[in-house]
Amino acid sequence: VTIDENNKKLYNEDMTDGKPTVYIDMDGVLADFFGGVEKMYGVEHWKQLTSDKTKDLKKEVIDRITGTDFFATLPIFGSAGELISMVKEFTGGKFSINTSPLRGDHENSAKYKKLWIQNNIEQPDEIIVTGRKESYAKDKASGTPNILIDDRPVNIQRWQGAGGYGILYQANRDSLDKVKKGLEDYGKVQRDQ
């Protein structure tokens, strides 16, 4: 067996035929972050909390959830299971999570996000907790653009800027058809290249 044949064999075993990894964000896509905030404050809708303009609500919420198990307690979106199934159908059975930690509470928030995943959804192939999601935009070995499904436009922009394929999706606002179309379009983009 030549070195070339070995390399080819290893390459083919590691590669899923140039298939992308599909990364799903957690908050806003699978887990209802704002639903968690509403529950914590005992309000019907989080916008009720924005009436007091003297407060920096974002800072207050972050201060209040830092060091707690907040992320483990988030409600799951009703569409989460179907979204995961859709991704698995596209990839041939795989999906990964790529979620950001809470700034200033990295280890703790990562721990409770992982606990949420363990308790609420089937186990992903990989769980990545990073503030730099875009470093996973392309497969390092093959250069295949990976897919990110995320609710934040800035994350999608950075992902695309790093050569990945982004699908902007907010579970409380968008239909799963948006994800379905995004996955179908990825296939078309790849075929056209």
Language model regions located:
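Active-site neighborhood of HAD-like aspartate-dependent phosphohydrolases
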Residues: 12-65, 161
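Short catalytic/ligand-binding loop motif for oxyanion handling, primarily in non-cytosolic enzymes
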Residues: 31-34, 39, 95, 104-108, ...
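Substrate-recognition element of Asp-dependent hydrolases with the DxDx(T/V) motif
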Residues: 71-76, 80-113, 117
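Substrate-recognition "cap/lid" segment bordering the active-site pocket of phosphatases
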Residues: 98-146, 156
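Short amphipathic alpha-helix with an adjacent loop that forms part of the alpha/beta core around
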Residues: 137-142, 179-190
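Acidic, Mg2+-coordinating phosphoryl-transfer loop and its flanking beta/alpha structural elements
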Residues: 146-185
